[in-house]
């Protein structure tokens, strides 16, 4: 769900940082938030956090709700990327409180989804389901599918296969291109494995292998290897296990490179 962020405090400051620092005197809270975003993009989590917290010190008492929403959301995302969920959750809830003062249905939907994801990660499934359902109620049609898939996957992990199927089926008609169908196919594959419909599972998982998203490909290969093991198909088990290991190594190497 979330990527791990590494710090690179020894990296020389980029020109964009030096330029942004010059604007701090004019609009300190806005400039500091911007510097936080830049450092976050540069994988320097500690420096990003420092800028965001400085921005809050200056802007907390203002009525610039738009900026406060951005800062708290950025902090929540920063903590979530580092799997510091106990700190991410209150940040996202602060976003929600400011969205009550400055309503925005799109931002509200995504914030509710982020809170639902955190609750799912900390094993509070009932709270997660409540927030996913609230997110769906606020969401525009074009964004509803991804939230339905998240909720379907949660039900799948809880072995509530009927509700998982309902969510996934509701999501599919909302997607109009094959590229974004792959996450649904992956969820369907997992669901059909869980309900022992292996031919149907293979049908959808073989589609996922064509995905350009390396994580989706890895997931499909892992589950195809699972099916081969269930069917005692040694050739396919070796084939998909090897492909999965290669794909997983690529993910690990890519993550390691990003964190240097």
Predicted regions and their residues:
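Short coil/turn linker motifs that delimit alpha-helical repeat modules in TPR/alpha-solenoid proteins
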Residues: 24-27, 44, 63-64, 103-104, ...
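C-terminal motif of bacterial Sec signal peptides marking the signal peptidase cleavage site
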Residues: 5-7
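Conserved alpha-helical positions within TPR/SEL1-like repeat arrays
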Residues: 21, 33-41, 66-81, 106-121, ...
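Hydrophobic positions within repeat-based interaction scaffolds
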Residues: 9-30, 46-49, 86, 126, ...
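Amphipathic alpha-helical segments of tetratricopeptide repeats
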Residues: 54-58, 63, 94-103, 133-137, ...
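Eukaryotic tandem repeat interaction scaffolds
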Residues: 132, 137-211
């Amino acid at each position: 769900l979330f990527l791990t962020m590494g710090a690179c405090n020894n990296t020389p400051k980029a020109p964009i940082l030096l330029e942004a620092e010059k604007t701090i005197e004019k609009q300190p809270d806005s400039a500091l938030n911007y510097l936080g975003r830049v450092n976050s993009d540069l994988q320097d989590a500690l420096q990003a956090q420092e800028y965001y917290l400085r921005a809050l010190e200056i802007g907390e008492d203002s009525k610039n709700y738009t900026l406060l929403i951005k800062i708290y959301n950025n902090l929540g995302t920063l903590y979530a990327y580092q799997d510091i969920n106990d700190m991410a959750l209150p940040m996202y809830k602060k976003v929600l409180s400011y969205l009550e003062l400055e309503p925005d249905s799109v931002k509200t939907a995504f914030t509710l989804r982020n809170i639902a994801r955190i609750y799912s990660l900390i094993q509070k499934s009932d709270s997660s389901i409540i927030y996913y359902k609230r997110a769906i109620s606020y969401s525009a049609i074009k964004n509803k599918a991804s939230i339905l898939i998240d909720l379907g996957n949660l039900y799948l992990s809880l072995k509530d296969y009927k509700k998982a199927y309902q969510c996934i089926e509701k999501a599919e008609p909302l997607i109009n291109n094959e590229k974004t169908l792959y996450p649904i196919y992956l969820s369907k594959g997992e669901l059909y494995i869980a309900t022992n419909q292996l031919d149907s599972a293979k049908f959808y998982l073989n589609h996922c292998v064509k995905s350009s998203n390396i994580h989706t490909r890895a997931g499909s290969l892992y589950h195809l290897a699972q099916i081969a093991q269930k069917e005692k198909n040694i050739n396919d088990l070796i084939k998909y296990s090897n492909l999965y290991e290669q794909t997983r190594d690529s993910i690990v190497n890519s993550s390691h490179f990003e964190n240097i």
